[in-house]
A protein has these predicted regions:
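Active-site C-terminal subdomain of aminotransferase-like
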Residues: 1-84
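Glycine-rich beta-alpha junction loops
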Residues: 4-8, 42, 94, 119, ...
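Short, amphipathic alpha-helical "lid/cap" segments that border enzyme active or binding sites
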Residues: 47, 137-144
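Alpha-helix N-cap and loop-to-helix initiation/capping positions
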Residues: 55-58, 97, 135-138
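Conserved PLP-binding catalytic core of the aspartate aminotransferase-like
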Residues: 61-68, 75-109, 119-124, 131-133
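Short amphipathic alpha-helices in soluble, non-transmembrane regions
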Residues: 101-106, 142-148
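Cytosolic Rossmann-like ligand/nucleotide-binding regulatory domains
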Residues: 115-116
Length: 149
């Protein structure tokens, strides 16, 4: 079972199973029976993305490396950074401090928005960095330098 959501920028899901399970699901899953099939353009897009995924290994490796580098730097600086993905939160704490830090990063050219209550619990305001494979090592180094300021 898997989905085609965020990971490949599409919609829908799939299941790989034996024929007997397929028949069972078709005949017993009312929610499945009464759903609408995906439009052909969605299926074509998903196929197009899936065909290209193997060639993107280098980009995935780079994204993992810069994500780990940023997480390590934030942790070393004393920030709580609970993340296992390329979305890296820098938990600052107080809303006011988070806003000031975000504004400082923005003035230096980084797209950094504060995330505050009620989106997150009181006292856990943060800046959430959504990294992409297009971000360079140099840019991450600049960000870390600013954070370490």
């Amino acid at each position: 079972v898997g989905t085609f959501g965020k990971a490949i920028a599409s919609a829908g899901a799939y299941i790989v199973c034996r024929q007997v399970i397929r028949e069972y699901l078709i005949n017993k899953m009312r929610t499945f029976i009464f759903t609408t099939a995906l439009p052909p353009i969605n299926i074509q897009w998903t196929s197009w993305v899936l065909e290209r995924l193997p060639a993107l290994q280098q980009k995935r490796t780079h994204l993992l490396q810069i994500s780990e580098k940023l997480k390590e730097a934030l942790t070393t600086k004393g920030y709580n950074c609970p993340s296992v993905s390329h979305i890296v939160p820098m938990i600052v704490g107080a809303s006011e401090d988070t806003i000031l830090k975000a504004e400082e990063l923005q003035r230096k050219g980084f797209y950094a928005l504060p995330v505050r209550p009620p989106t997150v619990p009181e006292g856990t305001s943060r800046i959430r960095f959504s990294l992409t494979a297009d971000i360079t090592e140099h840019e991450i180094d600049q960000l870390i330098k600013l954070i370490n300021g």
